[in-house]
Amino acid sequence: RSRGLGDVYKRQVRNHLFDQRRAVMVHWLILLNVVIFILGFFFQVDIPRNIYPPVHLDLIQLYGAYSEYTCFHEGELWRLLTYQFLHANLGHIMFNMIALWFFGPVVEERFGHGRFLLYYLFCGVAAALFSSLLGDMGFFDPEWRFIPMVGASGSIYGIMAACAVLFPHARVQLLFPPVNLSVRQFALAVLGVAAAVIIFQWNNAGGEAGHLGGMFAGFILTLLILWKEKLSSPRRKDASSSHYSPEPSSRRP
């Protein structure tokens, strides 16, 4: 019998909750981000003008946020990783962690725990580098290279890209606007928004460049993973079949 849309939603929710129980890395990432965000409230500082443009950060962000200047001109390369676990405000971390909780488990289940973590971190690094690349190409004000960048958004957008490749026809119900989209349509929509913000130089164009970089990196990396799996699968089949060598039949016609 045909299933109604309500049945589809129930099945998706049931499957998602089942995936959540096995999403070990997603749970640890969410916990780590939340703990670091809370700790930041106890270490509030004002940034001197000769280090950054006038902004207000906490002490953890001061030594963990990414900027092109501090990372490459001062050699603090660890910022490519640490900035991914820092967030600007409550809304920022809530959006990212909800998205990680929603999209992350199915990708972790597909990739495995270790490979998922490496994928997550790689997309975050690619997001920062892509943002700096566009800045060096003149898309943003030269001051951009000094402005601290924080957030897991680049990694999250990379996970969205993986979902769009692996599960393109899965459905996403948005609350605002209240529309139902496939994961592929949703990924293309957020990709279009990020591109428009960069092209028209709207607010947070540099941050949207990071989103775009994370999504591009995730798309390419997911395709490479699938390609590698496709190449190795015939070898696994050959190896398994080589263990079985039936004896020739003793019967004669």
Question: What residue spans do the PLM features occupy?
Answer:
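C-terminal transmembrane module of polytopic alpha-helical membrane proteins
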Residues: 7-34, 38, 44, 194-253
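Transmembrane helix-loop-helix
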Residues: 16, 76, 80-163, 199-213
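Helix-to-loop transition at the C-terminal end of transmembrane segments
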Residues: 38-56
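Extracytosolic (periplasmic/ER-lumenal) interhelical loops and adjacent juxtamembrane/interface segments
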Residues: 50-85
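Hydrophobic transmembrane alpha-helices
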Residues: 104, 162-166, 218-226
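Alpha-helical transmembrane bundle and helix-membrane interface signal
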Residues: 109, 166-181, 226-235
